[in-house]
């Protein structure tokens, strides 16, 4: 055994061993308990960042621990390889997205392997490869034929210069993020998943997920947003509108119906179109609205604007004429594109009515009283007894709901309805680097799904996009085809799918990644699924996790899987933060500086008191700790750390610095501390092994001092097992091992019994560290005399007898202040403990001249003598 800890050699040897032995390749073993551990797969951006390292280390620790419990553990990895960054890089560097993506995958795979992950690489999937997306297209065609996928016009953000659709987050201050063009709203045909058909189940089956953080489940509940309310019809005023009909609205507060003073419709609503005829001012406003964002969040925060239409509708209960306004805060794709406005009890309506001097009629008595004077108060939105509401006055919310519903049903102008905030999922993207949508457009047959024997529709990979719309729409060799039904000339769909589709089912493909008979091989899928432990960032709480849950139910209904949910347990890891530094330019702009280029001055307590730029010695500002990012230049390259300290040190620091679900603050001194600890472990083991094999331990013959050492060993096993297995608090498990190391380093090594006990202690340290620092553990286990690798060793089990103490050291207090200790047999009674405490010399000294009023004995811990 080499005298010094040499991580580079140790880690290379361990990884070579695992590769040659195919240690982490698994197959179905009926009768053996399975554990499927999965970390969210990475986008191949080019290089790993510390967030990746943390994510995959957490997953690897859990996987290795479960393997040591004797389970058949599956931990796969792959690549979420389609998406916008590849197109942008292609445009910037004039390189095909495929080439850029595959080069990044090769580099990042080597980086991941250098972390020593226990991954079954034989199951690797890459979502941009036809052998993967072929099955996505296969499922698409089946769902299209069932009506679960459908095509309709949708409102999108259109960039007239780049000739493409932009996501809401790509619209900045009304302009395209790349072109700077003013964005238009456009109606274009798009494909949608009917996720709303599963809204109730997606909501209710959240209750079947006790292993998910409550925060994530709450976010999904709010996103799905089930609300019970009423559909109310306001009959058209035929004199102003010129035809019979009714304006349909949905409200969750039908109790406030008697307070409606106007109605507002979206710019795209048919009544808005009708009113704009011959009204240039209204038409200009409608055009302005159509140029705005289609994002609900943007609409909520923007200034409320509107235009009157000169149209009226009738109040369904009173017959009163209410004016119709076009308002920018009403969205056509939400609800019915119209709202009944009750300014007294809705903040948006209040703001709008105040601005345009519309009537505000209070109809609910709230804790703010019967009136609703400006400014708006949150209390105005409360439920309470009705006022100013005719026959409904005095009724509370539920009674008012029922009575108003009965009155509307009687007049055939309303009914109760459950509505969801969740919209159907539009998946069409006018992008190149994505999975082609397998539809052919035929003038005779309409939209025809591509037959299974013609799948996959292959995306050409030798294309360099220029940013102006989709290249596929300009490639006749791609879109010109024959109709699969009638054989006539037809046109292939040139939109590609939202990349969230690929990540909605990848976890299932890992169960049978090479299966060519379908999306999954059902027996393999049902053997491994659902995933036992899923790990990823909280930023995926809504979209990815909701879409994956939806897809799992689609696969279940297609007979591909039998379970209802994809992920039993979810761990959302915290971010990796680091210190930031900057200089303020005269323009007011901050120029961020990499921490590696900064020299710090610290006080005696190691607190930073000043920072200077190393190159010029001049001061820089300390910006505080923030998430590692390219923009703030505070990222640390994992490869640099691995090259300098080894993967085990990085892994140990990541696990020790913070609980996995909390933010982790990067610390160079913390990394160095982790490295020093591994050197201590190596040094102690090297000294022990150098003295030759130790004999067997005679537990019956242990001295009190040896019993105390053994108690520390088994206390560490007990606590670490609880910390990792039950609580996923890897940081406290590491702390247990560090505490044990302190004991072992001080333990005597003079006798054969001492050496046998140290052998047990070092084996325990090795086993407890094995999931966290697998390379050094691999080497230590061999050096400690074992033939089988540590990955096949079982997790240690604590000996309950070793934890039993013959004697206990108790604290003695006088009037709450520490005055000494006494050693007592563990079996001593309360009376015996009190008697021993009373005659302790320190107690006698501090109670001299006082009367002992009370003696409090806390068994196994302390004695407090109260005297005055």
UniProtKB/Swiss-Prot annotation:
It holds the Pfam family tRNA-synt_1. Its main location: cytoplasm. Coiled coil: none annotated. ATP binds at residue 630. A motif ('KMSKS' region) lies at residues 627-631. GO terms for molecular function: aminoacyl-tRNA deacylase activity; ATP binding; leucine-tRNA ligase activity. CDD domains: Anticodon_Ia_Leu_BEm, LeuRS_core. The keyword Aminoacyl-tRNA synthetase applies. This is Leucine--tRNA ligase. It comes from Pseudomonas syringae pv. tomato (strain ATCC BAA-871 / DC3000). The gene is leuS.
